[in-house]
Amino acid sequence: MTTSGALFPSLVPGSRGSSSKYLVEFRAGKMSLKGSTVTPDKRKGLVYIQQTDDSLIHFCWKDRTSGNVEDDLIIFPDDCEFKRVPQCTTGRVYVLKFKAGSKRLFFWMQEPKTDKDEEHCRKVNEYLNNPPMPGALGGNASGGHELSALGGEGGLQSLLGNMSHNQLMQLIGPTGLGGLGGLGALTGPGLASLLGSGGFPTSSSSSSSRSQSAAVTPSSTTSSTHVTPAPAVPAAASVTSPSPVPSSGSGTSSATSPTQPIQLSDLQNILATMNVPSGAGGQQVDLATVLTPEIMAPILANAEVQERLMPYLPSGESLPQTAEEIQNTLTSPQFQQALSMFSAALASGQHGPLMSQFGLPAEAIDAANKGDVEAFAKAMQNSVKSDQKEGDSKDKKDEEEDMSLD
């Protein structure tokens, strides 16, 4: 089946196909920070940003010689900023600075020409803080940005005029923009007037706008630097979008043939009758309002909890794995935002099969299928209590055996 991404590249200026699997990539080496001085690692490296199948954005650095990926960080919108270090005058040094805590990762450009430096920096910030719409365009790196250009009524009518009813249903279906909040990319005066006063199923589309709303906020870097980097061999970087693929199938409406232009009223009627997932109609629970920093503080003070959470912290140089870092991470605005996004995704009722892959109890999977966040949390809590009872029972049995031996 043709993906909805094939409907757009020919309509949006500048879109093109490519085989690159990364949103943005460029050659750069790592640097180590000691005191107020950064020292370059002379290995040939590659910085790249990738969106995986779970829609998460990864900022990565790998050794180009060995192919080993040494840094793989999951980044949420407004989590960090990538900027040049102006204090360094002997090389082209950039820093990935996290807004929560003191994490900083330094890199030095290995591209021989400087003309793309500013563009690479801009694209890194763009994709980290305004990632492509999850699942909407089959992995198209620039889909969300292209669709935003169609927000005007004229753009929408031009788009619809080139689509058959079959393509339109495909566009707003589960694999197109009808996914969780997918139509948010078309927001604008044109869509507002199109939808009128109630055509949009708000309960099924309220969650994903958070992932598109973050903006880059400049911050300062005060460390002094002494670097003498050496440029390496150039390599081309590209941002990709899919090439048009012809769609097949007959039209689904008897009133309008596939060759007849589609009007805005047609789309309005379809949107008004779209089915909302069963879990989205009930009362939704936002985990971010439950797991507040005040509630988490005494839990995070538990040494056993800290030990269990430590392996899940980001790893890499200049990224300490400490109890303080756990506190900073779980109480950060970015983590709260991630909780809200997870709550909305879970409430959609479409993630039961995904949860089953993690070996969760049947009660939790059933709650995920129903989109019941509260029941999901209770099922997980009951599972932990059951595991604790089994562990306590085993410990008690071992103690009794030891006593009998004495």
Curated annotation (Swiss-Prot):
It is found in: Cytoplasm; Nucleus. Residues 386-397 have a biased composition (Basic and acidic residues). Residues 198-259 have a biased composition (Low complexity). Coiled coil: none annotated. GO terms for molecular function: endopeptidase activator activity; proteasome binding. CDD domains: PH_Rpn13. GO terms for biological process: proteasome assembly. It comes from the Eukaryota. The keyword Endoplasmic reticulum does not apply. Residues 18-131 form the Pru domain. Residues 198-260, 379-406 are annotated as: Disordered. Keywords: Cytoplasm, Nucleus, Proteasome. Pfam families: Rpn13_ADRM1_Pru, RPN13_C. Disulfide bonds: none annotated. InterPro entries: DEUBAD_dom, Rpn13/ADRM1, Rpn13/ADRM1_Pru, Rpn13/ADRM1_Pru_sf, RPN13_DEUBAD, RPN13_DEUBAD_sf. Residues 277-390 form the DEUBAD domain. Belongs to the ADRM1 family. Component of the 19S proteasome regulatory particle complex. The 26S proteasome consists of a 20S core particle (CP) and two 19S regulatory subunits (RP). Component of the 26S proteasome, a multiprotein complex involved in the ATP-dependent degradation of ubiquitinated proteins. This complex plays a key role in the maintenance of protein homeostasis by removing misfolded or damaged proteins, which could impair cellular functions, and by removing proteins whose functions are no longer required. Therefore, the proteasome participates in numerous cellular processes, including cell cycle progression, apoptosis, or DNA damage repair. Within the complex, functions as a proteasomal ubiquitin receptor. This is Proteasomal ubiquitin receptor ADRM1. The gene is ADRM1.
